[in-house]
Amino acid sequence: MSAAEIKDKVYDIIVSKMGVNKDQIKPESKFADDLGADSLDTVELIMELENEFGVQIPDEDAEKIGTVQQAIDYIVNKKVS
């Protein structure tokens, strides 16, 4: 899966889980501040990313994922390694 495909899928998951329009999402968008996620939304988003991409995201790593780009980069790095 290419980085572009991962980005598209991450965007789709955000739209599905958070009820935002795809055009509202930017790489620098912060889940809490820009997209209105609360802590439960964030946990559900991380779980969906784990399920969709077949990766484990430990809590200490999940706490560092605050923007859309950080989520994409994390998944890309996990899928490559």
From Swiss-Prot:
Start and end residues of each Carrier domain: 4-79
Localization, per the record, is:
Cytoplasm
Q: What is its main location?
A: cytoplasm
| Gene Ontology cellular-component terms listed | cytosol; membrane
Q: Which residues carry this modification: O-(pantetheine 4'-phosphoryl)serine?
A: 39
Question: Which pathway, metabolic or otherwise, does it act in?
Answer: Lipid metabolism; fatty acid biosynthesis
Q: Which UniProt keywords apply?
A: Cytoplasm, Fatty acid biosynthesis, Fatty acid metabolism, Lipid biosynthesis, Lipid metabolism, Phosphopantetheine, Phosphoprotein
Question: What post-translational modification information does the record give?
Answer: 4'-phosphopantetheine is transferred from CoA to a specific serine of apo-ACP by AcpS. This modification is essential for activity because fatty acids are bound in thioester linkage to the sulfhydryl of the prosthetic group.
What GO molecular function annotations does the UniProt record carry, in alphabetical order? acyl binding; acyl carrier activity
The Gene Ontology biological process terms listed for this entry are: lipid A biosynthetic process
Query: Would the keyword Phosphoprotein turn up in this protein's UniProt record?
Result: yes
Described function:
Carrier of the growing fatty acid chain in fatty acid biosynthesis.
Protein family (similarity comment)? Belongs to the acyl carrier protein (ACP) family.
Supply the name of the protein.
Acyl carrier protein
What's the source species for this entry? Chlorobaculum tepidum (strain ATCC 49652 / DSM 12025 / NBRC 103806 / TLS) (Chlorobium tepidum)
- Point out the gene that encodes the protein: acpP
